[in-house]
Every structure is written in structure tokens, then in C-alpha cells.
């Protein structure tokens, strides 16, 4: 039986971590993907290495089309794919580190979330944070997706605080944020 709120929180975290580890299948789960017409002929998302966490996503532009991203400009790039995720999972859309380092290209909504009940095309919102125009062509690896479990919670409202002595029942952080714990 937990003695404090901190003990209860720690027990909840340990139980959650244990359930995630024990629920990992011995075989990889299958991600069903539907290709749209403009996604035909492109490689399906795949892991670049045995230890990769993300599956590469490619631009599903037409052969004749090139999207030029000027510095500061953003564009929504189609992948030509619809994900059919299992309930209890999401697909996170993340930038590719090489594009960010070499060209300043990143995903604007990071990580983007594809919910398990979404059945539209997966698109990637890219922005050019670099100094030069960047050309996006058909088949380019533009982002990566990580499939992750989702923990849904029950939400309950707390009563308003009655006085200063009950404001911080766990820890001493209070309402501090955005660098309030230090800058080193």
C-alpha cells in the first residue's frame, strides 16, 4: 500500500512500464497501409537499419512536380498513404535529422499525431528553417513515422486550492515552467 502521493505515483509508473514491456509482442505488429493512386510505385515505409525507431516516409508528388520551399516557407507534402493503425496505437510524424542538419528542413507540427481512427492520407507539414531554397521531388525521404502505444486517461477535476499551505502537495515546483528549474 503506498504511503504518500509520490509513492502512489511511482507505483503507477512502475506498473505502466511493466505492462508495456510485458505486452510487447514477440513478433512485430503489422501496420496495414493503403496506397493511393499517387503513392503507387513508391517504396513502402521501412526501417533503414535493424535498430531504427522510425519508418521513412517519402514524398508522393507527381514525376513532373517539384515543390520549392523558400526560407521560412512551409508546405503540406503528400505521402500517398493511408495508415490503418490498431486501436491503442498512434503514428508520430517526426523530422529526419539529416534534412534538419544539412538543409534546415523540419516538420512544423512535431511530432504530428496520426490517430488510430484517422483514415485520410498521411501528409507531412514541412518548413524551411534554412538559408536557401530546398527542392522536394517525388520519392524523397521527407520524414519518419514512429508507431507508439497510447495511454488514455480518465480526467477528474480537483477542487480549487483553499490556501497557500495546500498549493504544492507534491514537490516544490509550483506553477514554474519554461526554464524555472534552471538553465544548465
From Swiss-Prot:
Swiss-Prot/TrEMBL cofactor(s): Mg(2+)
Keywords: Hydrolase, Magnesium, Metal-binding, Nucleotide metabolism
GO molecular function terms noted in the UniProt entry: dUTP diphosphatase activity; magnesium ion binding
E.C. no: 3.6.1.23
Binding site for substrate: 96-98, 109, 113-115, 123
GO BP terms: dUMP biosynthetic process; dUTP catabolic process
Bias-annotated ranges (Polar residues): 1-16
Coiled-coil spans in chain: none
Keyword Magnesium: yes
Catalytic reaction annotation: dUTP + H2O = dUMP + diphosphate + H(+)
Pfam families given in the database record: dUTPase
Alphabetized Gene3D superfamilies for the sequence: 2.70.40.10
Biological pathway: Pyrimidine metabolism; dUMP biosynthesis; dUMP from dCTP (dUTP route): step 2/2
NCBIfam families: dut, PRK00601.1
Role of this protein: This enzyme is involved in nucleotide metabolism: it produces dUMP, the immediate precursor of thymidine nucleotides and it decreases the intracellular concentration of dUTP so that uracil cannot be incorporated into DNA.
Family (UniProt): Belongs to the dUTPase family.
Annotated protein name in UniProt: Deoxyuridine 5'-triphosphate nucleotidohydrolase
Naturally occurring in which organism (per UniProt): Bartonella henselae (strain ATCC 49882 / DSM 28221 / CCUG 30454 / Houston 1) (Rochalimaea henselae)
Amino acid at each position: 500500500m503506498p504511503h504518500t502521493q509520490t509513492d502512489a505515483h511511482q507505483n503507477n509508473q512502475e506498473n505502466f512500464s511493466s505492462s508495456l514491456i510485458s505486452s510487447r509482442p514477440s513478433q512485430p505488429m503489422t501496420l496495414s497501409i493503403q496506397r493511393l493512386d499517387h503513392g503507387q510505385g513508391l517504396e513502402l515505409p521501412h526501417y533503414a537499419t535493424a535498430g531504427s525507431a522510425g519508418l521513412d516516409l517519402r514524398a508522393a508528388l507527381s514525376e513532373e512536380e517539384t515543390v520549392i520551399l523558400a526560407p521560412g516557407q512551409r508546405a503540406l507534402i503528400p505521402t500517398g498513404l493511408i495508415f490503418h493503425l490498431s486501436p491503442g496505437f498512434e503514428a508520430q510524424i517526426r523530422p529526419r535529422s539529416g534534412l534538419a542538419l544539412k538543409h534546415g528542413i523540419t516538420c512544423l507540427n512535431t511530432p504530428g499525431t496520426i490517430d488510430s481512427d484517422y483514415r485520410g492520407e498521411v501528409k507531412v507539414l514541412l518548413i524551411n528553417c534554412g538559408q536557401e531554397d530546398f527542392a522536394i521531388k517525388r520519392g524523397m525521404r521527407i520524414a519518419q513515422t514512429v508507431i507508439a502505444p497510447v495511454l488514455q486517461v480518465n480526467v477528474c477535476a480537483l477542487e480549487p486550492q483553499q490556501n497557500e499551505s495546500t498549493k504544492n502537495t507534491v514537490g516544490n515546483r509550483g506553477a514554474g515552467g519554461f526554464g524555472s528549474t534552471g538553465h544548465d
